[in-house]
Amino acid sequence: SKTLHDRVVNINTMEEEADQLYISSMHTLHTTCTDPIEIISWREIYMYLEKCADACEHVADVVESVVMKNS
């Protein structure tokens, strides 16, 4: 449906924004932080947030695909 497709597009857009935030945050972290433990901690947090965003995008794409195949 059009509404579902619009929502999937919105989720994909948000995931692209999350990618940019991840890159920007990692750059800032590595250029401003001097404590290795803090860098490792934040890097792990950022990595898991990025994986969450990727997983949300994947779920949206799968749901859209299932709906399209069954309509």
Where on the chain are the PLM-derived regions?
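Cytosolic, long alpha-helical scaffolding segments
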Residues: 1-71
